[in-house]
A protein has these predicted regions:
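Surface-exposed loop/turn motifs in large extracellular/passenger domains
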Residues: 1-201
């Protein structure tokens, strides 16, 4: 489910943008699908993914990202799988995290679930496009497990020079991080959370 491309496998994705609203509901047993502002699922195999911009509000039940809900790369060591991508849309889980399925898991400003991937010079300021401001009555938006400003969950993935910018929001309930919700056999290089960025749990 996506604003521009539902599934892309081994094709270059360059200079695309999305706006408006993207909402989706997926089966909860398969990680290799997602809901994204640009793409639901991206697999690069060395193809270029760069200069993508999302301003759409994206909401889904799992693997939700401003650029891609699910992203699988090839070039982990170099930072070239995904580069120079930006999100300014509000990214939310539509459901609370479930202990017996993947519902409510993997929500990220750029990528919800990253597998064997490298991201470089990606930036997120979630909610800025619509002028969103968090209020106490918005506590029902605090849903999701593994929620990150850039990546919700990274498996064997690396981030280089990525930033969560000021005046953006990362809204979740468990394992919420300004840059990454959680990493498994992964790494960050010079990740930056701006001083005025807001993480709410």
């Amino acid at each position: 489910v996506a604003g521009v491309i539902e599934v892309s496998d081994s094709k270059s994705v360059i200079k695309l943008s999305a706006s408006g609203t993207v909402t989706g509901t997926l089966p909860t047993g398969d990680t290799a699908r997602g809901i994204g502002g640009i793409a639901g699922s991206l697999t690069t195999n060395g193809a270029a993914v760069k200069t993508l911009t999302n301003s759409a509000a994206v909401t889904g039940n799992r693997s939700v990202g401003g650029i891609a809900g699910y992203f699988s790369g090839k070039d982990q060591a170099t930072g070239k799988d995904m580069s120079d991508c930006k999100n300014e849309g509000l990214i939310l889980s539509s459901t609370a995290a479930d202990d017996h399925s993947l519902a409510g898991h993997y929500i990220g400003g750029i990528v919800g679930y990253a597998h064997n991937a490298s991201l470089s010079e990606c930036r997120s300021r979630a909610g800025y496009a619509d002028g969103y401001t968090y209020k106490q009555e918005d506590r029902d938006k605090l849903r999701g497990r593994y929620v990150g400003g850039i990546v919700g969950y990274g498996e064997q993935s690396v981030l280089y020079d990525c930033e969560t910018e000021a005046n953006g929001y990362v809204l979740g309930s468990e394992y919420v991080g300004g840059i990454i919700g959680a990493l498994n056999q992964s790494d960050t290089q010079t990740a930056l959370l701006s001083e005025n960025g807001t993480r709410t749990t």
